[in-house]
Amino acid sequence: MHALTVRPGTPNSIDLTTVPEPPPSDGAVLVRALALGVCGTDREIIAGQYGWAPPGEERLILGHESLGRVEDAPDGCGFAKGDLVAGIVRRPDPVPCPACAAGAWDMCRNGRYTERGIKERNGYGSEFFRVEPDFLIKLDPALGPLGVLIEPASVVAKAWQHVRRIGGRAPAWTPRVALVTGAGPVGLLAALMAKQMGLVVHVLDHNDTGPKPKLVAALGATFHLALDDVPCPDIVIECTGAPSVILDVLGRSAPDGILCLAGVSSGGRQFPLDVGGLNRNMVLENHVVFGSVNANRAHYAAAAEALARADRDWLAGIITRRVPLARWREAFEPQEDDIKVVVDFAA
């Protein structure tokens, strides 16, 4: 079968290669790939900056944003031929640590977790893949090809779950205004879930051309180019990872405000910061800043529910390009108006 593979640590080694059929040891459920989402992590792996091949192998099958249909499944596993499904990315560490033992592998304490298409496990970027039933999510059939958004949606679902848990420290916490920084796939899905929670939503992005402002408006949210135009938010979901944006939103929230950092930054840049002023503001206003990454099964389930409730046409607007597998290279060549690019295995 064909698969998108890379040699981790070697820049631009990505290629469409022929690989063996997935072994039963990968999981009891055989899935035929329909689509594969492309994200920044994939580009980092392709650039040789990140990623680990499975032990004893030179190449890694790329891809962690999956969508497929069950081709074969054992009786009693909860899945049947034809089910629309997506695979969970992370697997718990082998020790396991207390978090992984409790099913919260997204909070792994020792770093020995593995990840499909990223760290020591082949990904979902092949014509067929196998998955363990416990790491497979069944999607609403009505979602069809839009189900490929489940992985970024799961990351957002975790962020919102933790925001609610932290907010519960104050019995009378009743947030009204949410700010999402960044109108990429994660930011737009964060805004979607905020609207589903009944919040007044503002979205900040540096680009007011292309489809992003229209998607924000169609959601019933307000698009901004400048932070000064945004009302004081109760919740901030930071999705850019841009240091300058992070500095701008620190301490900008309302009393008892919560800032979730969901974007990953690259290091090496320094910015001036009034630490004393920031500390004073955070202490006196009961502010919380926390980071959030990855997702566990409960978050995938919440994401699947959120996508099923969403307007299909709006979700379709997030996917700006679908590239057939035969022209796969185009999917990894960014274009100006890209939001989410998908490799179409069914075309």
Language-model features, listed with the residues they occupy:
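C-terminal substrate-binding/catalytic core of Rossmann-like NAD(P)-dependent dehydrogenases/reductases
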Residues: 269-319
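NAD(P)H dinucleotide-binding glycine-rich loop of Rossmann-like/cofactor-binding domains
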Residues: 94-177, 181
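C-terminal hydrophobic helical "lid"/dimerization subdomain
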Residues: 247, 297-347
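Residues in the short beta-alpha loop(s) of Rossmann-like NAD(P)-binding domains
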Residues: 205-209, 265, 295
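Glycine-rich beta-strand-centered segment in the early N-terminal region that forms part
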Residues: 22-36, 51-98, 140-142
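Mid-domain Rossmann-like dinucleotide-binding core that forms the NAD(H)/NADP(H) cofactor-binding site
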Residues: 143-227
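Glycine-rich cofactor phosphate-binding loops and adjacent beta1-alpha1 units
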Residues: 165-177, 214-287
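Residue-level marker of beta-strand positions
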Residues: 65, 83-84, 99, 128, ...
